Amino acid sequence: MYHSVADPAHDPYGITVAPDRLDLQLRWLAARGLTGVSVATLLRARAEGRGRGLVGLTFDDGYADFAAAALPVLRRHGCTATLFVLPGRLGGDNAWDPDGPRRPLVDEADIRTAAAAGTEIASHGLYHVDLTRLDGQALRDETTRSRAWLSELTGRAPEGFCYPYGTVDGRVAAAVRAAGYAYGCAIRPPAGLGGPYALARTHISQADRSARLWAKRIGHRTGLR
């Protein structure tokens, strides 16, 4: 799980990875016979019994640096990824982060560029809010309106949804399923919640090099069992 690909120097959250560190991390995958792909591609491959050697790569929040900084590195390594975007904030910034530096978000042109390069465009909701705190109508808006908006923009209904802040419960997962998505990405889903609408992910940071990547991969695989 990635977020912004840029200079991480002033990021208090540790969610920014420099392009050269992303390059190192993808080289680490390649050296072990692993290829980064979108979540939709990974799930289809697993369903067909051919998921071996594939790793799902996701980029949350839809930062504008994805097209300029992440895409060239992904292409260099023959990888694809899923970009989770916020249709209600296109061309805006990460206003939900009170302490971090303001970072621009993708606009419509950026999304089309990413999609044309083979990136899976998926929904992160409309505005990056904790969905578990919303009433029924607001939750439906975040899930259904964001899907309709992205469908119109890309000409293709998004298959995936990513829960802002990674927070999900049974009600939210059910709303995502009802909206027509094929899967939902969390971080560490609560106990008792599993399946395609509560997919666990592992955060990758600037600090992650060979030893840490190995430990995180083992931890992630163990957690999926």
Q: Across the structure, where does each feature detected by a protein language model lie?
A:
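A short, conserved beta-to-alpha structural element at the edge of catalytic cores
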Residues: 78-100
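Surface-exposed cleft-lining segments at the edges of enzyme active sites
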Residues: 92-102, 129-136
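Structural detector of well-ordered beta-strand residues that form the stable sheet scaffold
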Residues: 82-84, 122, 182-185
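A short, flexible beta-alpha/helix-coil linker loop
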Residues: 5-8, 88-89, 127-130
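Acidic (Asp/Glu)-rich catalytic clusters
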Residues: 30-31, 72-78, 104-123, 177
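C-terminal active-site subregion of NodB/CE4 polysaccharide deacetylases
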Residues: 1-58, 64-67, 133-225
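Generic enzyme active-site microenvironment
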Residues: 58-59, 122
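Histidine-centered catalytic micro-motifs
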Residues: 4, 121-128, 164
